[in-house]
Amino acid sequence: MSFDIAKYPTLALVDSTQELRLLPKESLPKLCDELRRYLLDSVSRSSGHFASGLGTVELTVALHYVYNTPFDQLIWDVGHQAYPHKILTGRRDKIGTIRQKGGLHPFPWRGESEYDVLSVGHSSTSISAGIGIAVAAEKEGKNRRTVCVIGDGAITAGMAFEAMNHAGDIRPDMLVVLNDNEMSISENVGALNNHLAQLLSGKLYSSLREGGKKVFSGVPPIKELLKRTEEHIKGMVVPGTLFEELGFNYIGPVDGHDVLGLITTLKNMRDLKGPQFLHIMTKKGRGYEPAEKDPITFHAVPKFDPSSGCLPKSSGGLPSYSKIFGDWLCETAAKDNKLMAITPAMREGSGMVEFSRKFPDRYFDVAIAEQHAVTFAAGLAIGGYKPIVAIYSTFLQRAYDQVLHDVAIQKLPVLFAIDRAGIVGADGQTHQGAFDLSYLRCIPEMVIMTPSDENECRQMLYTGYHYNDGPSAVRYPRGNAVGVELTPLEKLPIGKGIVKRRGEKLAILNFGTLMPEAAKVAESLNATLVDMRFVKPLDEALILEMAASHEALVTVEENAIMGGAGSGVNEVLMAHRKPVPVLNIGLPDFFIPQGTQEEMRAELGLDATGMEAKIKAWLA
């Protein structure tokens, strides 16, 4: 869409942060109003992350107004909230392309803008990176300031606290802003607290505090008295004891929607030495009532009509794989009170809403804490329960040592329900489920299953749940199932594939939900088609049978080729000295960018047309 200057006259004056800093302060509330309306107008037309950005408009304006970005370095955690940042940093007219193939990246991205200091997508990385950036800035001696913005969800992760603990030790000059949008601003976060925050961040208070510490540093009783007095005074009005104990100077909480108040506080804090912590309270979805009332639903939105206040409803077609998992989870829990389900803050995305309501005492949302989720599951298994960890492929990467050390070595029966495996679409490089087969396949005695449809997915979940000799994993994609009939649950024979079609010279060994595309290719080329089902243990007998009865083999998977299921087939053939040609089809050796799943599969040659073209070129 073209930018309407008449509709957004103040925003039209801001093509860069340099122009933003030329505006009089009195015009900034109007700028915030226009920025919020422009965000609503843009995202409702194009889709994207929505409610978080509405809540950070004033903070974004204030930070870029006070700090000399991009010289001063502003780091956004995760990046859902960074749409206003993109709009103010030269990308205003392209915001309608966000999350689309070839468009703006969904998160801050170093290759896109000098204002994007850190490429992000996963949570809780900002403070660690910020410490490194602040230390580097100090060593180069250019008085470059560092600011990290982190949300109340991301700060729950252990990595954030590890970083703050380190910052308290080495004391770099940096500011951490906690964007706390868990609740609306209450009365005690009003004028009095804002005044106190400005006072506590001001030069008089800082000078008295630091001066007093220096003067009485050699007099232990007085020094301790000063410290206790300061703690008592601040403790009466400031809920920041934890952050103070970690070594930060805590200011807040303050109203995150008072742009002028934020500017005053940020200016006061800008030149303070050591690690500073500013706690702001915001409303997720601010300025758009439907998003304020239901920020979870409006977190990420498709195209919608903002005047209706409603998101378009599902067409009522086939269920998603997440829904298939959620239904199986409820069905199994109703029969077995030993079932325990765990998610690291992905209840809705993983299809666990119904389970959480029906079985609240067996549902555990551990927040953004993937490492803890896995070891917590290990403890439940040791205690005689049957834990299921529902987790996205890309987030399981964050708990790899726990899978190895805490689950697999001890042969604990933990089932990993791995959602969003393969190409996920619009969230791009940071969220593609490209590597789980590669990083799990090397774990001794782990069972790994790849269903080709929703019925097989249910059977594999059932099989993994009843597998007691160690961990198991079922990986399934983002998106809808294919519409096959659901049959009664039964355990599959471990490590056994099935032949779906008999052909002649070529055999296609398929792993996972690319099966419908592989079936089209098999029909076109008169090839044998095998549903391998298990990546580990592989059906070696079936692989050797296919090698003996065909001139060439093709493996198909939606995982990185390197180290994936196809690599496993190659290893089997080499171990048995079978010199049959093998073509491995899967994800190439680069990070897959954003685009719809259909667009990216077509581009990477993972649809039927692309697979057939690759096979014909290879056979030529």
UniProtKB/Swiss-Prot annotation:
Q: Which residues bind Mg(2+)?
A: 152, 181
Q: In which pathway does it act?
A: Metabolic intermediate biosynthesis; 1-deoxy-D-xylulose 5-phosphate biosynthesis; 1-deoxy-D-xylulose 5-phosphate from D-glyceraldehyde 3-phosphate and pyruvate: step 1/1
What UniProt keywords are attached to this protein's entry? Isoprene biosynthesis, Magnesium, Metal-binding, Thiamine biosynthesis, Thiamine pyrophosphate, Transferase
A GO BP entry: 1-deoxy-D-xylulose 5-phosphate biosynthetic process
Q: What is its EC number?
A: 2.2.1.7
Q: Which InterPro entries match?
A: Dxylulose-5-P_synthase, THDP-binding, Transketo_C/PFOR_II, Transketolase-like_Pyr-bd, Transketolase_BS, Transketolase_C, Transketolase_CS
Q: Please give the subunit comment from the record.
A: Homodimer.
List the NCBIfam families.
dxs (TIGR00204), PRK05444.2-2 (NF003933)
The name this protein goes by in its record:
1-deoxy-D-xylulose-5-phosphate synthase
